[in-house]
């Protein structure tokens, strides 16, 4: 099983890349974590935002292979504790399908992406900056793995 974070937005600050890579390298080879960046469409004063979101959604879905699981990160998704995420990670592993975690742009995910989602996950009721979400996701996937493997990282 491979986990891909498919996120709208690119050219993140260096600290974001370093934070993400820190957790990627901590994970074992049998749980690869990959980042796929979808360029954010330019939003001008008179932009058709619905069209831009739809285009970003199409680009996101083009990175998903047939049969792979889609998990969207949404404000109204289900909040998971660390232990619940670890249980989900174990279910995903046993299912043996690749998992795609989908993070939309500033206006959220395209309806087409949400319609394909098998699970909706909310990190927090707070609005979080997109760069921070990447690091937070990397850390939480790592933490869930440590719970499953009995590693002392999560106490």
Swiss-Prot record:
Disulfide bonds: none annotated. GO terms for molecular function: rRNA (pseudouridine-N3-)-methyltransferase activity. GO terms for cellular component: cytoplasm. The keyword Magnesium does not apply. CDD domains: RlmH-like (cd18081). Its main location: cytoplasm. It catalyses: pseudouridine(1915) in 23S rRNA + S-adenosyl-L-methionine = N(3)-methylpseudouridine(1915) in 23S rRNA + S-adenosyl-L-homocysteine + H(+). It is an enzyme of class 2 (transferase). The keyword Kinase does not apply. PANTHER family: METHYLTRANSFERASE, RIBOSOMAL RNA LARGE SUBUNIT METHYLTRANSFERASE H. This is Ribosomal RNA large subunit methyltransferase H. The gene is rlmH.
């Amino acid at each position: 099983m491979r986990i891909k974070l498919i996120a709208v937005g690119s050219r993140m600050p260096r600290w974001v890349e370093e934070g993400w890579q820190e957790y990627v390298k901590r994970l074992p080879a049998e749980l690869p974590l990959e980042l796929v960046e979808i360029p954010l469409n330019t939003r001008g004063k008179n932009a058709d935002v619905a069209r831009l979101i739809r285009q970003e959604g199409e680009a996101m879905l083009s990175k998903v292979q047939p049969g792979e699981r889609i998990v969207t990160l949404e404000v109204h998704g289900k909040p998971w504790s660390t232990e619940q995420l670890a249980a989900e990670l174990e279910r995903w592993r046993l299912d043996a399908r690749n998992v795609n975690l989908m993070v939309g742009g500033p206006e959220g995910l395209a309806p087409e992406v949400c319609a394909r989602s098998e699970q909706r996950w909310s990190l927090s009721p707070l609005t979080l900056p997109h760069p921070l979400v990447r690091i937070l996701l990397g850390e939480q996937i790592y933490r869930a793995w440590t719970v499953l493997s009995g590693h002392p990282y999560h106490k």
